[in-house]
Design a protein with these regions (language model features):
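Short, well-ordered beta-strand segments in beta-rich or mixed alpha/beta enzyme
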Residues: 38-47, 78, 85-110
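Short, glycine- and small/hydrophobic-rich beta-strand elements in well-ordered beta-sheets
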Residues: 24-31, 64-93, 124, 131-136
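Short amphipathic alpha-helical segments
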Residues: 51-77, 113-123
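Surface-exposed, polar helix/loop patches in the mature regions of secreted/periplasmic/lumenal proteins
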Residues: 99-136
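N-terminal secretory signal peptides and thylakoid transit peptides that target proteins
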Residues: 1-18
Length: 137
């Protein structure tokens, strides 16, 4: 085997081993894993310019920055899925799902300078915002 071929082989083998370790590091997938002891904050945004891809991109950029608040455990920025059933509302432009460890972390987020700056810089883009907060029952 030539030196170049050997290097390619070693490089590919290393990447394959790394990919395998990532899969096993996450552990086996569990169906229906329940999130416990968390505070869910789900925000839906309707844009003033509903069809504007530029405004949607700008808001997504702002949400990405907002996701840097230290008390946020996890987040997801999404758009309506291409599903069609009577119970599904796809009229919003973007949603932002946030997981906090507790109510105190969510309360801290409300006054965090990053959150206040987000509202100041991006509020002109939306016409309506609805928030659904939930905790364990």
């Amino acid at each position: 085997m030539s030196l170049l071929s050997r290097r390619k082989f070693i490089g590919h083998a290393g990447k394959t081993a790394l990919a395998g370790s990532v899969i096993f590091a996450t552990g086996p997938q569990q169906a229906g894993k329940n999130m416990k002891n968390v505070f869910i904050h789900h925000v839906y945004f309707w844009l003033k310019n509903a069809g504007s891809a530029a405004d949607q991109d700008k808001l997504a950029e702002g949400l990405q920055k907002l996701s840097g608040v230290k008390t946020i455990r996890q987040y997801h920025i999404g758009k309506p899925a291409a599903t069609s059933r009577d119970v599904i509302d796809t009229s919003y432009a973007l949603s932002w799902l946030v997981v906090f460890d507790n109510d105190a972390d969510q309360a801290s987020y409300q006054t965090d300078p990053i959150h206040l700056k987000f509202v100041e810089d991006y509020a002109h883009l939306w016409q309506k915002v609805i928030v659904y907060d939930s905790v364990d029952r």
